[in-house]
Amino acid sequence: NTSGLSFTTSQYAGTYNSIDINMSGSSVASYSNQSSGNLSLTSTRRSDGLISYAKFSTAAGDQTFDTNNGATIATFTKGAIGLTSNNDGALFRLDTYSGYGMWEITTGNTSRVFVGQSGTNLTSNPAAVVSSASYTGYALGILTEIGYAPIFTTADFSATANFSSGSMSVSTSNTRGISLSTGNDLGSYSADNISGTLSKSGSNNYTYTGTVTSNYASNSISGTATLQVYGPSAESVAGSAILTRGDGTRNHALSFGGTR
């Protein structure tokens, strides 16, 4: 019953990366890297705090979670879980100035997984606002290994930024599996916590990139993370990464963000 509720629609702009996960039955058979580019995220939040609509738009395709059209969106401490009527899933979080998440579009036996970050406005020069800052938040993703079923993941995220020098350390902790259909906790995946140091990238002052790694079973998986700073006073950060083990058999696609 939505009687008496008001609705607020927000628009976020950002970037994404993607990977195809090819399935054999319920198990992962192979991976192939796909496109990256611009992301547009549209969301509608009800006055009771629930999210009724989220649309992720990219040149590679759109995915819509609309509770008025057969989808479900459930909120939990770290963000929201979306499921379409054909069971494509999403894990995402919307902060005041930024949003981040992962979502999938399934065609036949292939699930294209997207991870991305977006916001309402970028901080043009964070160092002019604050020389250093600490951020805390969450990470949301999907962990896959050839021969096994995919596992959706959540974690705690932290970042320590030195905007004056243009560096930022990032890490996750308490990585755990989660069922999108039930919200149940699936246990610890702490070996898939990530860490790394990012540096200011390109001609702007609000984009940071660098390598992040985890050390599952003493066999490191790594990838490039991209993070951006959002808000009029550098209130939040959001980023994403796709990590792959050297032999190509394990992959962790995740997004992350935090506020100060």
Labelled PLM ranges:
Residues 1-260:
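Mature soluble binding/inhibitory domains
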